[in-house]
A protein has these predicted regions:
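Helix-loop-helix hairpin linking two adjacent transmembrane segments in secondary transporters
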Residues: 127-175
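A late C-terminal transmembrane helix in Major Facilitator Superfamily
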Residues: 316-349, 357
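Extracytoplasmic gate region of multi-pass secondary transporters
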Residues: 19-20, 200-241, 248
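Juxtamembrane intracellular "pre-TM" segments in multi-pass secondary transporters
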Residues: 175-204
Length: 389
């Protein structure tokens, strides 16, 4: 069950970033601007922000049918992109997958709660969430290797097959009902208001807005921004692969260390500075090796920042942990949309775009300074109350 779900999560990320690693090639193929191609990826955070709350409600009321439909829509979107060699068909397929994404990604905790024993749920959630990283890596590898040099159709066929197989498996395994669970996928209104009233929660959301926003902007636009410097699609894809691989390894190592030492403030301050200097290096460095070092360093801090923030938010929220996690994801996707659109405006001025991302990163400095250790404890020493409900 969890494996099938994890692979569907991978498929959503694979289809999300299909065109991001080959933006210039896609623009030539469809006869549109690179800005238009950017919307093939940017539609995902946009629809996530719009649909996350309705998706959670659907999952709470009709969990198995909603999740099965989400998986089926992912597969359908992959095949719709094969309907014709036009931008309209590509966008239609991306919209279908983007509609399914909040349903699929919001289901992980509830799926583990209904189908796994209590002592296996944390592992199940980790396995399910790992699919997102697998999908991102696949997209960044397959795009330049299968879709470059006029072979976009071949890439779309392979990705459609990779989407339909796990979707079919998920539909089949969901025919078996799970056990009743107290896990909720929806954002609960009263809990959300209580959480948002806590300054530490707003600080965490601001940090994830900045960090996830920069990551999404880089994943969407790096190839286009580096093309004028003579960096090939394959090389740009390799840079992003290095970033995600380094970040994935760091996600397994750094969050427990940071939590054990209550070092969230120091880590976030370092992540902000590395993000800023990394963006400046990507814009100014004349050598590919320096750019590679910069983006790998960014991956090491930006990707682990998300689970660190999620853990802190859930500890702050107490029994409203599910709502806290959903709010953090909403903030991250909103940041992804806003920062990616900012870069899109500057996409024909690469240095300005990289400097703008560096400036966005610096917005996290005052936010990081507000963090206390442990999270939620005011500087006066009295812990903020966890949210109940």
């Amino acid at each position: 069950m969890i494996i099938a779900y994890s692979l569907v999560c991978a498929a959503t990320q694979l289809l999300w970033l299909t065109y991001a690693a080959i933006t210039t090639e896609t623009a030539r193929r469809y006869g549109v601007s690179v800005g238009a191609v950017g919307w093939l990826a940017e539609i995902f955070p946009l629809l996530y922000v719009v649909l996350a709350i309705p998706a959670g409600i659907l999952l709470d009321r009709w969990f198995r049918p909603a999740l099965a439909t989400g998986g089926a829509l992912v597969a359908l979107g992959g095949f719709v992109r094969l309907g014709g060699e036009t931008f309209a068909w590509a966008m239609a397929g991306q919209v279908i997958v983007a509609v399914a994404q909040p349903v699929v990604l919001s289901a992980v905790s509830k799926l583990a709660g209904e189908y796994l024993p209590a002592d296996q749920r944390a592992t199940g959630i980790a396995v399910g969430s790992a699919g997102t990283f697998v999908g991102i890596l696949l997209a960044l590898v397959l795009g330049p290797t299968l879709g470059a040099h006029g072979q976009l159709e071949r890439l779309l066929v392979v990705e459609a097959v990779l989407a339909v197989i796990p979707a079919a498996a998920l539909v089949i395994v969901l025919r078996r009902p799970g056990h009743a669970s107290e896990e909720h996928a929806a954002i609960e209104g009263s809990a959300a208001r209580a959480l948002w009233a806590l300054p530490p929660m707003r600080t965490l959301c601001g940090l994830v807005f900045v960090g996830f926003g920069i990551f999404v902007a880089l994943a969407t636009w790096l190839q286009t921004l580096l093309a004028p410097a003579g960096v090939s699609e394959t090389a740009a894809g390799g840079l992003l692969v290095g970033m995600v691989l380094a970040g994935t390894v760091a996600c397994a190592v750094l969050p427990p260390l940071v939590a054990r030492r209550h070092a969230e403030r120091g880590f976030m301050r370092g992540a902000v500075l590395v993000g800023c200097f990394g963006c400046v290096a990507l814009g100014l460095a004349p050598w590919l090796g320096v750019r590679a070092l910069a983006i790998v360093a960014m991956g090491v801090v930006l990707l682990p920042a998300l689970p660190i923030i999620l853990t802190a938010a859930e500890q702050l929220a107490g029994s409203a942990a599910g709502t806290a996690g959903a709010i953090v994801w909403l903030a991250g996707n909103l940041g992804g949309l806003v920062v990616a659109l900012l870069v899109q405006i500057l996409v024909h001025h690469p240095l300005a775009a990289f400097l703008a991302m560096g400036a966005v990163s610096l917005l996290g400095l005052p936010l990081a300074a507000r963090l206390t250790s442990p999270i939620g404890e005011p500087r006066g020493g009295t812990p903020a109350p966890a949210v109940v409900g």
